[in-house]
């Protein structure tokens, strides 16, 4: 008799994925495998996006198979622009995990925790490779879910002497600063927040540039995480063109990233190519990691959650 799939709530996913740092080793391996092409055993098309124009929304479908994990997943994610000030989150996601040997559905799990934690973990990987030596100042632009997940892993993995925060709505920035462990300086402007920062994380809902090259310290590293549509951007032309540009996926960046497409910036390497040693990490230069998020990242996290849940049954 066929077994019914497991349904794992956000709380259950959180229980089995308490620290984003757990994801770093398997994500490094998965990113390297992805960038090896067919030889790496990762089958992952660029996400399919269905506009829901009537309601200012989108549905994204993100399937992947990884031979290394022998795992098959797809994530369904929705994004609705007008929900930033309502009780309904702007982003909602579910991850489906299948038995790759026969196609049976093993589990349906909340994808919001997975998305937040795997995105932050990949940013941490990029930062470990690309940040300048002696990085003391971290700046986070944006105060939403991704700001919290990035702060968590960045304060676990690195030893910054100062953390700065800016958000368009100052009240949310102050709430962030009072909620997290550790001291966070709330800044009144993006320029104030980023001036002299060694590592900058942009996790905003911006559709036009908010971070300008003239404000950025030479040699700084930027993780650009927001602006996941081809007509949206967070970084200006000057910054995109003067920095060495790294991406998670060339194919996806050239289809989905307004920061890349609208600036005409050249992509130097995928993050997986740096991990494998195929391309260098230019820590001495200003670097940008444009993160769009990939299905294989969800796969790694979902497999880890499911294996942990299964072992505890």
Swiss-Prot record:
GO terms for molecular function: hormone binding; NADP binding; protein homodimerization activity; thiomorpholine-carboxylate dehydrogenase activity; thyroid hormone binding; transcription corepressor activity. One of its GO terms (cellular component) is nucleus. It catalyses: L-pipecolate + NADP(+) = Delta(1)-piperideine-2-carboxylate + NADPH + H(+); L-pipecolate + NAD(+) = Delta(1)-piperideine-2-carboxylate + NADH + H(+); L-proline + NADP(+) = 1-pyrroline-2-carboxylate + NADPH + H(+); L-proline + NAD(+) = 1-pyrroline-2-carboxylate + NADH + H(+). Expressed in the spiral ligament of the cochlea (at protein level). NADPH binds at residues 90-91, 118, 143, 145-146, 167-169, 172, 204-205, 225, 291. One of its GO terms (biological process) is sensory perception of sound. It is an enzyme of class 1 (oxidoreductase). It holds the Pfam family OCD_Mu_crystall. The keyword Acyltransferase does not apply. 3,3',5-triiodo-L-thyronine binds at residues 47, 256. Keywords: Cytoplasm, NAD, NADP, Oxidoreductase. InterPro entries: NAD(P)-bd_dom_sf, ODC_Mu_crystall, ODC_N. It is found in: Cytoplasm. Its EC number is 1.5.1.25, 1.5.1.1. Homodimer. Binds the thyroid hormone triiodothyronine (T3); T3 binding inhibits enzymatic activity. PANTHER family: KETIMINE REDUCTASE MU-CRYSTALLIN. Belongs to the ornithine cyclodeaminase/mu-crystallin family. Catalyzes the NAD(P)H-dependent reduction of imine double bonds of a number of cyclic ketimine substrates, including sulfur-containing cyclic ketimines. Under physiological conditions, it efficiently catalyzes delta(1)-piperideine-2-carboxylate (P2C) and delta(1)-pyrroline-2-carboxylate (Pyr2C) reduction, suggesting a central role in lysine and glutamate metabolism. Additional substrates are delta(2)-thiazoline-2-carboxylate (T2C), 3,4-dehydrothiomorpholine-3-carboxylate (AECK), and (R)-lanthionine ketimine (LK) that is reduced at very low rate compared to other substrates. This is Ketimine reductase mu-crystallin. It comes from Mus musculus. The lineage of its organism: Eukaryota, Metazoa, Chordata, Craniata, Vertebrata.
């Amino acid at each position: 008799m066929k077994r019914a799939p497991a349904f794992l709530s956000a709380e259950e996913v959180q229980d089995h994925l308490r620290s984003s740092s757990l994801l770093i080793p398997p994500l490094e391996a998965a990113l390297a495998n992805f960038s090896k092409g067919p030889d790496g055993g990762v089958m992952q098309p660029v996400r399919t996006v269905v506009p829901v124009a009537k309601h200012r929304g989108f549905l994204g479908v993100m399937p992947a198979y990884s031979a290394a994990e022998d795992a098959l997943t797809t994530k369904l994610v929705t994004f609705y622009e007008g929900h930033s000030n309502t009780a309904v989150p702007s982003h909602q996601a579910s991850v489906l995990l299948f038995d790759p040997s026969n196609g049976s559905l093993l589990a349906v799990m909340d994808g919001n925790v997975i998305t937040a934690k795997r995105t932050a973990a990949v940013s941490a990987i990029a930062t470990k490779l690309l940040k300048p030596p002696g990085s003391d100042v971290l700046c986070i632009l944006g105060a939403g879910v991704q700001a919290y997940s990035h702060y968590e892993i960045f304060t676990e993995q690195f030893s910054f002497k100062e953390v700065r925060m800016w958000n368009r709505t100052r009240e949310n920035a102050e709430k962030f600063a009072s909620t997290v462990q550790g001291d966070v300086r709330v800044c009144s402007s993006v320029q104030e927040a980023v001036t002299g920062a060694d590592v900058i994380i942009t996790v905003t809902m911006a559709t036009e540039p908010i971070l300008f090259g003239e404000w950025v310290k030479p040699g700084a590293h930027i993780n650009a995480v927001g602006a996941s549509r081809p007509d949206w951007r967070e970084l200006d032309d000057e910054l995109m063109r003067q920095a060495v540009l790294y991406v998670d996926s060339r194919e996806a960046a050239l289809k989905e990233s307004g920061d890349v497409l609208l600036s005409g910036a050249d992509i130097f390497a995928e993050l997986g190519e740096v991990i494998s040693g195929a391309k260098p990490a230019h820590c001495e230069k200003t670097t940008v990691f444009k993160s769009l998020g990939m299905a294989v990242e969800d796969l790694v996290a979902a497999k880890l959650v499911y294996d942990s849940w299964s072992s505890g049954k």
